[in-house]
Amino acid sequence: MIDRYKHQQLRIGSVSPQQISAWATKILPNGEIVGEVTKPYTFHYKTNKPEKDGLFCERIFGPIKSGICACGNYRVIGDEKEDPKFCEQCGVEFVDSRIRRYQMGYIKLACPVTHVWYLKRLPSYIANLLDKPLKELEGLVYCDIESYPNFSFARPITKKPTFLRLRGLFEYEIQSWKYSIPLFFTTKGFDTFRNREIYTGAGAIREQLADLDLRIIIENSLVEWEELGEEGHTGNEWEDRKVGRRKDFLVRRVELAKHFIQSNIDPQWMVWCLLPVLPPELRPIIRIDGGKLMSSDISELYRKVIYRNNTLTDLLRTSKSTPGELVMCQEKLVQEAVDTLLDNGIRGQPMRDGHNKVYKSFSDVIEGKEGRFRETLLGKRVDYSGRSVIVVGPSLSLHRCGLPREIAIELFQTFVIRGLIRQHLASNIGVAKSKIREKEPIVWEILQEVMQGHPVLLNRAPTLHRLGIQAFQPVLVEGRAICLHPLVCKGFHADFDGDQMDFKVPLSLEAQVEARLLMFSHMNLLSPAIGDPISVPTQDMLIGLYVLTSGNHRGICVNRYNPCNRRNYQNQKRSDNSYYKYTKEPFFSNSYDAIGAYRQKRINLDSPLWLRWRLDQRVIASRETPIEVHYESLGTFYEIYGHYLIVRSLKKKILFIYIRTTVGHIALYREIEEAIQGFSRAYSYAT
């Protein structure tokens, strides 16, 4: 449905009989009103065509083939010159056959029927609103005279003396009435009394719901709740629990009444007079081998409802000669048939077919993982999507993700085909697919061009908040797993222990704009709930930062005078003997040389080294004394401290300063420095 703000939405709830009639009823061009399903038949056994006024009637639900009526005549759809727009012989409109996916019908019930979801599901909405025990209402609905009366007195509709007015004159209720009154159901003249003052079955429930004033219910419930609260504890545990349960019931009753008022729902709509019939394409008949037809369970349950409803209609037409108990039994059968259609097995033993197989009711069709909502509407499989395991991609940018080549070529295959044809590298789709199967080099070049203009959406179930689905710029990677930056894992509540994520390609221009402007991962650095940073180092990143900056903290003395420390120094085994050659800690004039030496595997990540420091950034402590002093032949000397080294001239002027560090510290420092400089430039541009 579409609201007044033109927002498409889906709302599930009770509807009025007028709304059901408006959905299912249509007026043909000749003025005939159709929509009511009166026959339990499906297809004729000789012609294999839908029966008129049956569950697959073409007059009610539309033609099976677009533009072809039941007689076989053909008209062009949408052509205004074609006249008439429906067949005068069979009454079928010349419209698109897709109308059979959404055109509904209805069954006019011979007696009111309660909706089993509102009666039997816990908590029972009908029992809560009427403030009556559920068993009493079930005895009324299902005509169980042994436990509860199967009738209810109606309010007086005239000012004349009635049995109900006479009953109200008595001070006490005569309990024997509810057993003696049904004995008069077969007497002459009782039909007038029954129709005027007595309701049975679901009709009694509907009248009681129609008499309710929801606002008065709210006021009375609040007053009673306050009175129970003022009484306090009685000291009797049983009584206190009883009072607590009553207070909880009053709260639920108030909330339910408020919901009905806010959603503008009349409580009597929980009792049906018109039963909606689903479109035939949602309960199809399939032709199997041998020419046999296999019907869906929903259609079979509809047939049972129509059979029993037609039987009740015939009994009511001959009500003068039909015993009242027989009518009530048939009303019970209609109620049970509708209950089975909506929720098979809710009242106990489910109904089965001839092969002892349980019928699949409407509740079974829509609920669960394989139901209509979760499988077909909400979580259905769509094109341009896939799923794979996620692994860490440490070399990726925050807004990028790595797609395996095998997945990417299938995901963007249509775009690659279009690119091959546009660049005249393939004459048709078949040739383009052949090039893709052979994995020619030009295919990967076009694929990379296509991926640059198409972001992908990554989602990890369950999507509990907005950051559960984010946009990324895809890049090609080897393997079969999706590579993801570890900083974005917290938003997805994901880790790299086998988690899977699905990805989709936004196709429309609006979706791509939304992905780039609102959903990119580098645009969602803060939690939308509390504003705290969401992209923070966790797990693998924390371990990596620790390893990167761990180094060797045992001090210069231990490292320098421990020749057995083979990891932190390059100890090379000589060919002439078995001892290890000791190599001094290397000196580097800048950080680029140090990182270059690490990439050439001349030093390790945590190997101590001396890095030249700027003279304007002093690291000398005021009272610190050097550990060693080395003198050169030209007069210069080195003052070696715990974590730095000073080179002085003959006149004790500081020439150079070296700090003792590792490649890991240098790499982290450079990343922080670049980030600060980038932030400073962005801030200067903004101001």
From Swiss-Prot:
EC class name: transferase
Chief site of localization: plastid
Cofactor note: Binds 1 Mg(2+) ion per subunit. Binds 1 Zn(2+) ion per subunit.
Record's keyword annotation contains Electron transport: no
Binding site for Mg(2+): 495, 497, 499
Subcellular location: Plastid, Chloroplast
Pfam families (UniProt xref): RNA_pol_Rpb1_1 (PF04997), RNA_pol_Rpb1_2 (PF00623)
Record keyword Chloroplast present: yes
One GO process term, biological-process aspect: DNA-templated transcription
HAMAP family for this protein: RNApol_bact_RpoC1 (MF_01323)
Subunit structure: In plastids the minimal PEP RNA polymerase catalytic core is composed of four subunits: alpha, beta, beta', and beta''. When a (nuclear-encoded) sigma factor is associated with the core the holoenzyme is formed, which can initiate transcription.
Protein name as annotated: DNA-directed RNA polymerase subunit beta'
UniProt source species: Solanum tuberosum
Source organism phylogeny: Eukaryota, Viridiplantae, Streptophyta, Embryophyta, Tracheophyta
